[in-house]
């Protein structure tokens, strides 16, 4: 007789294999927990080549293995990562090969703000594919804006910070608030309307601004209609939503993203002190340039004046020279007469001493003859010199440009002082200087008519 406690108790013993045990446990679990929702945090995410996803879902006290097969993983595989809070649906099962308790999932969605982040990434990918984020769409901000439109809440620190920066750096810029809600159910429609209204006002640039907050607080700036309203603006838009770490879809669509509203004001407000320094430098350069230009024009004018000296001045010089020659000739004749007289006196003295009567008579005759010839010679010489001077004066008068001017003609000069000799040297609208016989004119060319070609 066998010593069997089960037999003594009258019980039949059923011995299961490990596979049988795991199979029965699996069937029991799948029957009782055919569909459950579980929330937790992903860890130990594995992505094998098969396309299935395996990870551990955990909370603070426990964890469970999860399997998400390929057909159900396609929609979410790109956003899953360790640490992501998710909400999953599936059935409880047992992996018989290892006896591992696990969840077989058919649905997974981000939990908390995870759903918002999923929507954020989907819209970001969609708008990027349309080219709304492309660099070639970005417009430069105005260097010296005169008016800025601010699309923001009329209350709070944001508008005060922006106004403070502009008052400090560029008080001359006109600021206009286009009020809108920036949080809540009405915010999206109000922001779109405010952007459309501001874009029609002719501002040099727009600032779309809001203070910091959670992802839910800033979500209106991640709505597609707001993003498209920003993209449709003809006015350059600076997005200044939240703090430096906050990123919205509006930031990607705007022409420029500023980390904070104050930074947006800094970017658009030119420093007035720096502008004044630049203006002073430009003024000094302009004054120096004008002095150099005036000096060059004076030199050019002096040169032209010397080249266009009046022929009368040359005649005056020739007349002065003739008078000088006449004076010198008179003095020379006087000196010669005086010398002859002195020599005659000496000869007379010598003759008187020697009494050469015959020689004295001859000398007296010769002297008388010379005295008769001398005035004629002087008159002849003066007449010849005067005739030469008159001929020279007539020649100068004939070739003088002022003689031509005196007949009603004019000399045309361009802005560089060059003479205009043909119509092709001038063009309509050009300013010319006309020199007349008396005075000058400033002219403007209405039309130029070149001479027709001469026949062969």
Swiss-Prot record:
Function: Bidirectionally degrades single-stranded DNA into large acid-insoluble oligonucleotides, which are then degraded further into small acid-soluble oligonucleotides.
InterPro entries (alphabetical): Exonuc_VII_L, Exonuc_VII_lsu_C, OB-fold_nuc-bd_dom
Taxonomy, superkingdom: Bacteria
Reactions that this protein is recorded to catalyse: Exonucleolytic cleavage in either 5'- to 3'- or 3'- to 5'-direction to yield nucleoside 5'-phosphates
GO terms, molecular function: exodeoxyribonuclease VII activity; nucleic acid binding
Assembly and interaction partners: Heterooligomer composed of large and small subunits.
CDD domains with a match to the protein in the record: ExoVII_LU_OBF
Keywords, alphabetical: Cytoplasm, Exonuclease, Hydrolase, Nuclease
UniProt family annotation: Belongs to the XseA family.
Annotated organism of origin: Azotobacter vinelandii (strain DJ / ATCC BAA-1303)
Name listed for the protein in its UniProt record: Exodeoxyribonuclease 7 large subunit
Subcellular location: Cytoplasm
Biological process according to GO: DNA catabolic process
EC number(s) per entry: 3.1.11.6
Annotated Gene Ontology cellular component terms: cytoplasm; exodeoxyribonuclease VII complex
């Amino acid at each position: 007789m066998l010593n069997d406690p089960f037999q003594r108790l009258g019980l039949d013993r059923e011995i299961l294999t490990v596979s049988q045990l795991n199979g029965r446990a699996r069937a029991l679990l799948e029957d009782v927990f055919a569909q459950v929702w579980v929330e937790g945090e992903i860890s130990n995410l594995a992505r094998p080549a098969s396309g299935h996803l395996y990870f551990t879902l955990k909370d603070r006290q426990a964890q469970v293995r999860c399997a998400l097969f390929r057909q159900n993983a396609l929609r979410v595989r790109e956003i899953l990562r360790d640490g992501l809070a998710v909400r999953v649906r599936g059935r409880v099962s047992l992996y018989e090969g290892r006896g591992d308790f696990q969840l077989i999932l058919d649905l997974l969605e981000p939990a908390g703000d995870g759903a918002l982040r999923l929507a954020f990434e989907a819209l970001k990918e969609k708008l990027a594919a349309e080219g709304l984020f492309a660099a070639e769409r970005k417009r430069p901000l105005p260097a010296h804006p005169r008016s800025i439109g601010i699309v923001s809440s009329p209350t709070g620190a944001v508008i005060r910070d922006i106004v403070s920066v502009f008052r400090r750096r560029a008080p001359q810029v006109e600021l206009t608030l286009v009020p809108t809600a920036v949080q809540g159910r009405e915010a999206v429609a109000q922001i779109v309307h405010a952007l459309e209204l501001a874009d029609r006002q002719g501002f040099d640039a727009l600032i779309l601004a809001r203070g910091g907050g959670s992802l839910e607080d800033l979500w209106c700036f991640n709505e597609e209609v707001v993003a498209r309203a920003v993209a449709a603006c003809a006015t350059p838009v600076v997005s200044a939503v939240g703090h430096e770490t906050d990123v919205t879809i509006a930031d990607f669509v705007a022409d420029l993203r500023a980390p904070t509203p104050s930074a947006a004001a800094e970017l658009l407000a030119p420093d007035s002190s720096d502008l004044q320094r630049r203006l002073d430098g430009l003024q000094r350069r302009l004054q120096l340039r004008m002095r150099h230009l005036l000096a060059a024009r004076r030199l050019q004018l002096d040169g032209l004046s010397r080249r266009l000296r009046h022929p009368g001045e040359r005649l005056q010089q020739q007349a002065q020279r003739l008078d000088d020659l006449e004076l010198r000739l008179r003095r020379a004749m006087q000196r010669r007469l005086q010398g002859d007289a002195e020599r005659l006196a000496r000869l007379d003295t010598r003759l008187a001493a020697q009494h050469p009567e015959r020689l004295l008579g001859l000398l007296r005759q010769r002297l008388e003859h010379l005295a008769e010839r001398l005035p004629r010679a002087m008159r002849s010489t003066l007449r010849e010199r005067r005739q030469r001077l008159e001929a020279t004066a007539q020649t100068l008068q004939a070739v003088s440009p002022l003689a031509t001017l005196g007949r009603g003609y004019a000399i045309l000069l361009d802005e560089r002082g060059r003479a205009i000799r043909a119509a092709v040297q001038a063009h309509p609208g050009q300013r010319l200087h006309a020199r007349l016989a008396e005075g000058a004119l400033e002219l403007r060319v209405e039309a130029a008519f070149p001479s027709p070609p001469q026949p062969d």
